[in-house]
Amino acid sequence: MANIKSAQKRIKVIAKKTARNRMIKSQLKTAIKRFEEAVEAGNLEEAKVKLTFVEKKLSQAAAKGTVHKSSASRKISRLAIRLNKAI
């Protein structure tokens, strides 16, 4: 445990940010999984809706710094390509 007050505060702040990042990444994984299930099932209309939701969540995560901007862009691109191949 840190003895300096500022270090103690940083420990608390890091714990909060880690929890937030973990929650956001978990939501992203779930949303991507739901999209992939819709594509595999052949529900293209549902998959389009899921893709817009995933794009929104990935963009928000990139804006917050949870995932890198390039990583989010790459994932969005790959998911869109996957949907277009299914159509």
Curated annotation (Swiss-Prot):
GO terms for biological process: translation. Keywords: Ribonucleoprotein, Ribosomal protein, RNA-binding, rRNA-binding. One of its GO terms (molecular function) is structural constituent of ribosome. SUPFAM superfamilies: Ribosomal protein S20 (SSF46992). GO terms for cellular component: cytosol; small ribosomal subunit. It holds the Pfam family Ribosomal_S20p. It comes from the Bacteria. The keyword rRNA-binding applies. The keyword RNA-binding applies. Binds directly to 16S ribosomal RNA. Belongs to the bacterial ribosomal protein bS20 family. This is Small ribosomal subunit protein bS20. The lineage of its organism: Bacteria, Bacillati, Bacillota, Clostridia, Peptostreptococcales. The gene is rpsT.
